[in-house]
A protein has these predicted regions:
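Extracellular and secretory-pathway beta-repeat/beta-biased strand scaffolds
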Residues: 2-301
């Protein structure tokens, strides 16, 4: 592990072999399990949907890129939503235009790539399971035309809400998992073999799934003293991981945009979680952790 400091400012942590980093934080409790997705409105592409109003919703896309707006998008415990897409490279953007957060307490599956946008917040509960080729959960929005043009630039409202994962996210080989918001907390398991994992906190985030940069985060969202989790507890960091992030043969990046006067850690790394990127054959694992602010990363253990 190499930690670089310039003029007292921690710039980044880069690990290019087998890495195990332990993280600290508290695990939130969950007071709701959500409903099933309601009122789909297709904005782009060809889509057919069956099982509306039941515990098993099936979304069948007929084009490589689709955009669907929903009044709400949650999956209750025991519920299941399947996105059946033309190929593993097909991408479906799903945006919540109502006023309720998304709670994934059941199963969310796809043979392709999924994006879930909800400015009210996204929560994957301990029973929640996401199994896709790629998965992006964000409280920052993306312009429809940018999405269709492969320009994955996300913008927030100035005080964007958080993305919290306490469940299990499994990404197919070579895919990506991205959790983006004003703050991000992971106490679950995120696995992306030969793929990429990105946790980003800020008001402007750009994802690059092709190049080595993966993610650029700019524009701070909150002062930490004003951010609370779902239980009302004040958060100690913009990105907090007490679970497992694992991308063997791939890349993991954690980055938060903060004000220069921030007194608490932007990225919290402690003793109860792990960040793992082990090399596979000729493919090394890589981890990048950091932000431009002073005392931005805290490592314990």
């Amino acid at each position: 592990m190499v930690i670089n400091k310039v003029d007292g400012k921690l710039k980044r942590v880069v690990v290019s072999t087998l890495v195990l980093v332990t993280l600290v934080g508290t695990r939130p409790s969950w007071s709701y399990s959500g409903e099933m997705p309601t009122n789909p409105q297709v904005q782009s592409g060809k889509v057919s949907i069956t099982g509306t109003g039941t515990d098993h919703l099936q979304v069948n896309t007929k084009t490589n890129k689709t955009i669907i707006n929903w009044d709400s998008f949650s999956i209750h415990s025991g519920g299941r939503v399947d996105f059946n897409q033309p190929s593993a490279n097909s991408f479906s953007l799903n945006r919540v235009v109502g006023s309720t957060p998304s709670s994934i307490a059941g199963q969310l599956n796809s043979n392709g790539k999924l994006m879930l946008i909800n400015p009210n917040g996204v929560v994957i509960t301990p029973d929640g399971v996401v199994n896709t080729r790629s998965f992006t959960a964000s409280t920052l929005d993306i312009n429809n035309q940018d999405f269709l043009s492969d320009n994955y630039s996300f913008k927030g409202t100035g005080k964007s809400r958080g993305v919290i994962n306490s469940g299990k996210i499994t990404i197919g080989g070579g895919g990506h998992a991205a959790l983006l918001g004003g703050y991000v907390s992971n106490s679950g398991i995120v696995t992306a073999r030969l793929g990429k994992i990105a946790l980003g906190a800020g008001e402007k985030i750009t994802l690059d799934f092709v190049g080595d940069g993966l993610m650029k985060v700019t524009v701070p969202s909150h002062k930490l003293s004003t951010i609370t989790d779902v239980d009302g507890n004040t958060l100690k960091s913009l990105i907090n991981n007490t679970g497992t992030l694992k991308a063997n043969g791939g890349m993991i990046k954690l980055s938060a945009a903060t004000a220069m006067g921030l007194s608490r850690g932007a990225v919290n790394i402690g003793s109860t979680g792990s960040v793992i990127a082990q090399g596979i054959n000729s493919k090394p694992g890589k981890i990048v952790i950091g932000s431009p602010s002073v005392n931005s990363v805290r490592i314990a253990g």
